[in-house]
Amino acid sequence: MNARNGRNQHKKETEDKHMAAILSINAAGQSGKKINKNIYGHFSEHLGRCIYGGVYVGENSDTPNVNGMRTDVVQALKKIGVPVLRWPGGCFADEYHWEDGIGPKETRKRMVNTNWGGVVEDNSFGTHEFMELCRQIGCEPYVNANVGSGTVREMAEWVEYMNSTGDSTVVQKRWANGHKEPFNLKYLGVGNEEAITPEFRERFGLIFAA
């Protein structure tokens, strides 16, 4: 290769690099497969200050809030466009009993969070509070039910509580707690991966069969 050809080759490579650097692609209006927005979903668990002091401070807090939900956190979650939010865990889901988190807050059962630090929780953030959080964010709720220490019946009644339009005893509890209409939950998880024991597999089989 002579010097002239070498200079031309170098010039062409430089131009190619420059062109590649400014290449832009606009797919607007093009047809094709769409990415399911729910892959960008988020996860909330009773761990550290994720729930208490995080998304939830209570109605009587000096921290700005709407119905107990921290205004700044809700605004941040709305800004990033959370499509779906999972709760109550995680590991915590498999020790959470939903009936402890409904009804008047002053009478709710206190519990020890054995998964995360052994802290005592007052269950002031329960099903209704989670649904309120999702309403404020504008996302779909995703509830992960207790299979590790719960029963199939407990899970079934939680779904009934959230979604049934009938007038069963379970649904009447929802009415008494201020929510006449069902929550219309679309996404339900079945336990967490750390609890895959023979008992878990048995319960999962019963749930799947139902």
Where are these regions (language model features)?
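Low-complexity, intrinsically disordered or signal/transmembrane-proximal segments
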Residues: Q9-H10
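Non-catalytic accessory regions flanking glycosidase/transglycosidase catalytic cores in CAZymes
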Residues: E13-A210
